[in-house]
Amino acid sequence: MKTSILPLSSGALLLSCGLAAGAPAEHKDFEATLHAPFQAGVATQRTFTLGFDYPGLERPGIVDWRVELRRPGGRVALRWRGQASLTGSSVSVSLPWSGRIGRSPAPPGIYQVRLHAVVRGNGHEAVSQAWEIAVGTPARPRMPRFQALPGAALAPAAAPAPGGLPYNVYLGNLHSQTNHSDGGAELTACKGAQPPLSAPYGPDAAFAFAHKQGLDILAASEHNHMYDGSDGSAPDADAAKARALYQAGLASADAYSQKHPGFLALYGMEWGVINHGGHLNIFNSRELLGWETNAKGELMADTRTPRGDYAALYTLMRERGWVGQFNHPAQTGQFMVNGVALAYTPEGDEVMALCEVVNSTAFSTNVSESETRRSHFEAACNRLLEAGYHVAFSTNQDNHCANWGASYTNRTGVLIPAGVKLSRDSFIEALRARRVFATMDKGSQLVLTANGRMMGERFRNRGPLELVVNFAGSAGKQAAAVAIMEGVPGRKGEVTRLSETAAASFTPAQGEHFYYARVTQDDGNVLWSAPVWVTQE
């Protein structure tokens, strides 16, 4: 492994390898993560940690990586470069930074650390990750007073605070697997995705674990093409048994929710394949969708959906009233329609409500909510917004090991009207309204309003527009940085930063706009509001 840094001299890098593990073809993909401590350790020093993995790697490869430290405003202050060898095991690179730029201490402010990594000659797209860090003691943003919305412990009986928003917040993990596909592994044996239908723990165990962990919602989202017990095709598979397994999962979720009021157990599917495809969740389908057949020509599903035909899938989802989520989207090569990645269709816009913005690593065995390996997808979600999609942000764990909701403190916050019970129907209604926020801190909340209207709304406006970022931090946590982001649906351009304050009043240009808020806490955890969509007249 080689590394270089400009303008600083090279530092020693520590490399550690985890155990190699075979991976089903569904998870053969390059993964790169960046852990950048938000606050410095001793004096001004801190260490950035790069993680590289390639489940199912067929032959050794070289990762070329670049890390940039960007000043407030975006100018590059430092750049490190290096290489790492991939031999089938996970690789960790420690990158120390002294807190200095050249010979001088870095001025105080909110900086950004960016990782760009690619497997040499592999053909897969490069992976980019970016996180903010605090250098010195930056000035804190002024935040409006905001009374935190009641959570599940008080809902639905709790009345909103005087002048408060009439909603209760329910916290969920909307992406996980059990032994109905390639998840559900015992923690001590979980090194990656499991051979389909082989692990010990199913939906009942997942719902009970997540409930005990304090979640309000867990979605078991099983890979739709693994109900035959194979990551490929199984000629001798029993089609009736595959369909029955999906129905058993639905029944399990219904029974758990009925027996445990206040907890919503969801069962659905993660449709698609990752390579030359793209994964998406469907939360409310009572039908198993698929394309594989056995040797008799029997469909391993209730309803045939051509593999990779996202336009047809969106149309079917609209006809059935199903609601979906873009899972860990890549910026290129996924969700193709007519050869265009992340392509907009009116049907897709109607049914796709969420986009995962940050996930903890799918194969974590952490049960103390302290996992440091996370993947960041805000840039891909922004491309979907710029394409014209009306999606809110979510953050989930994609658990494949038996730690549903326990790998980190990230949750998707779902706003249900006060007085309305949490149910599958009220959950789906909230998703359709995009009343959702993503938080890496389960105790914090973020709601964006626009002229008093709720995030997720679409409305016409004349004259000034007032955006207010309403943030309630968990105990002892404060906002360290605020950004209001803006874009134009259908433009297919770049989302830009409108403001670094928690309130902005201005008159937009005529036409279509969207705005969302991002808040970074003083511990580095980040929250994203749902956007608002404004037609300025």
Functional labels for PLM-detected ranges:
Residues 299-405, 475-494, 507, 513, ...:
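Domain-core and long-helix interface of multi-subunit machines
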Residues 149-320, 326-327, 334-336, 365, ...:
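A metal-dependent hydrolase metal-coordination microenvironment
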Residues 94-108, 503-507:
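Signal that preferentially marks extracellular ectodomain short beta-strand elements
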Residues 77-95, 493-502:
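Solvent-exposed serine/threonine-rich low-complexity stretches and specific carbohydrate-binding patches
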